[in-house]
Each structure stands twice: as C-alpha cells, then as structure tokens.
UniProtKB/Swiss-Prot annotation:
This is Transcription antitermination protein NusB. Belongs to the NusB family. Keywords: RNA-binding, Transcription, Transcription antitermination, Transcription regulation. GO terms for molecular function: RNA binding. The keyword Cytoplasm does not apply. It comes from the Bacteria. The keyword RNA-binding applies. GO terms for biological process: DNA-templated transcription termination; transcription antitermination. Involved in transcription antitermination. Required for transcription of ribosomal RNA (rRNA) genes. Binds specifically to the boxA antiterminator sequence of the ribosomal RNA (rrn) operons. The gene is nusB.
Length: 139
C-alpha cells in the first residue's frame, strides 16, 4: 500500500507533466496513479491534491512569485515549481500542520531536485507559511 509521501511524489510527476504543457494529463491522472500503485485512500488523496493545485494554480503562482527573492518564476526548475505549487496548495487549502507540509516538500526536493533544491524549497515555503500564520495572506 502506498504512503502519503509516495502519493505526493506521484502528484509531483503529474504537476511536472502539466507544467511542461501537457494539459491532457488531467484526463489520465487516475491511470497514471494506478500504474504507480497509488490506490484507494491514497489515490483519492493524490487526486484531490493534483486537482486542487491545478484549480488554484493562478493564486498559488502569485503567492510563490511574491516570495521569490531575486528570481523569476520562469527561472525556477519544473520539479521545484511542482514541489512549491503542491506545498503552497497544502499550506493554504488543507488542514495540515505547516511543519509537516514543509518537511514533506523538502524531502521530495532531496529526492527529485538538485542539491540546492531543498534549501530553496524550505526558504520559500517557510516564508509563505509565516505569512499564513500571521494572517496577512488569504487564499
């Protein structure tokens, strides 16, 4: 049985494909999750994360852009962008503890990104989480 971490990793793959210009990925998301053996509750969890992130993508991207110091969104790698998008979605649209969201994102960055990815992901998501905690940003 797949874990939530594995479900999130599969969602990163879906978001990555979507970001590369494959909007058809939405139609095949369930099949792709089945291929990766993401089933039952974890499949529902993964689909909710993917669909929610895509649905709120414009708002999520604005939040990310606001916290990119000296960076353009286009300079952020596709994997890192997918991880940030999922992390921001979970920070704003789920009841998960921000520390868990950030830790999961950093672990995904360690596995899927470059050597610099974990620190970058941690910094951006931490800044966004602090803003959420202070109530100065509403989704």
């Amino acid at each position: 049985m797949a874990t939530r971490h594995q479900a999130r990793e599969a969602v990163i793959g879906l978001l990555y494909a979507y970001d590369l210009g494959n909007p058809e990925i939405k139609k095949f998301a369930e099949d792709i999750l089945e291929e990766k053996k993401i089933r039952n509750k974890q499949r529902e969890f993964a689909l909710a994360l993917f669909k929610g992130t895509v649905e709120h993508l414009d708002t999520i991207d604005e939040m990310i852009k606001k916290h990119l110091e000296s960076w353009d969104m286009e300079r952020v790698g596709h994997i890192e962008r997918a991880i940030l998008r999922l992390g921001v979605y979970e920070l704003f649209y789920t009841d998960l503890d921000p520390a868990i969201v950030i830790n999961e994102a950093v672990e995904l960055a360690k596995k899927l990104g470059t050597d610099q990815s974990p620190k970058f992901i941690n910094g951006v998501l931490d800044a966004i989480a602090k803003e959420v905690k202070n109530g100065s940003q509403k989704a």
